[in-house]
Design a protein with these regions (language model features):
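Signature for HUH/AEP ssDNA processing cores
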Residues: 1-75, 82-94, 98, 105
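Residue-identity detector for threonine
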Residues: 31, 37, 61, 85-88, ...
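Generic detector of bulky aromatic hydrophobic side chains
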Residues: 50, 101, 138-140
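Short, solvent-exposed polar/charged micro-motifs at secondary-structure junctions
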Residues: 78-80, 146-147
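C-terminal accessory nucleic-acid interaction domains of nucleic acid-metabolism proteins
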Residues: 106-228
């Protein structure tokens, strides 16, 4: 990458968006320097902001520095957690799982349908691949529309984006390990399928296992209705 590449990203003068820079989070040694949680509200049928704030509130409770960026489209957001040294993608994603699970348990009224994925999206680099690409913030064309910028918890953009970035706090690996010990949860999968997957492929359906169902259920019939 050259200076002009970053300048063009920030300037955003290409009408086709060909100057946008993205980043593959996972290094060759399967480590990363950040966890980015993507909340995407393409349909605009539900409020992604409440989902984002629930995630951020857990971060605040756990003393995890977290920063909100409004997406380039304006219909979603990224929640960024930065690490002061590279950590394994496995650990980073495990932290994201724990935060998201806690956020869900704190407010049962939230559907979290806007949750899309984590970046990195894998624990390890796929063989022969680079992982998933995340667009960097502060893209010029989107910024002129008030998007691709860091915002406060009222979703108002910070007046000075560079000053805000100069004051971010990063999570240490020692702090990360302690959080994982205190808040261990099972692995959480994707809650949302988007057009960015492979829409031309038939999704793989896992067969249901007998242990997924109770051995007995009680069925009550009344007024020609069935109640469980």
């Amino acid at each position: 990458m050259a200076y002009n590449d970053f300048f063009n990203h920030l300037a955003g003068k290409d009408a086709w968006g060909r100057d946008v820079i993205g980043l593959y989070p996972i290094r060759k040694d399967n480590t990363c320097s950040f966890l980015c949680t993507d909340f995407d509200d393409k349909s605009c049928e539900h409020g992604y902001k409440n989902d984002v704030l629930a995630f951020v509130n857990v971060c605040k409770t756990w003393n995890v520095p977290c920063y909100i960026e409004r997406s380039r489209s304006g219909n979603g957001a990224h929640a960024w957690i930065f690490f002061d040294t590279p950590v394994t993608a496995f650990k980073a994603r495990k932290l994201g799982n724990a935060i998201l699970t806690e956020a869900m348990s704190c407010d049962a009224h939230l559907s979290f349908k806007s949750y899309d994925r984590f970046f990195p999206n894998q624990d390890t680099l796929p063989k022969g691949g680079l992982g998933n690409l995340v667009a960097l913030p502060l893209q010029g064309m989107a910024r002129r529309k008030g998007n691709s910028v860091f915002v406060d918890e009222d979703f108002n953009a910070y007046a000075d984006q560079w000053e805000m970035l100069s004051q971010i706090h990063k999570l240490s690996e020692v702090e990360l390990d302690l959080l994982l010990q205190l808040h261990a949860v099972p692995t959480l999968g994707e809650l949302s399928k988007t057009c960015e997957e492979k829409p031309w492929e038939t999704p793989h359906m896992d067969a249901a296992q007998s242990e997924d169902y109770p051995k007995q259920i009680v069925l009550t019939r009344a007024n020609m209705l069935m109640f469980l």
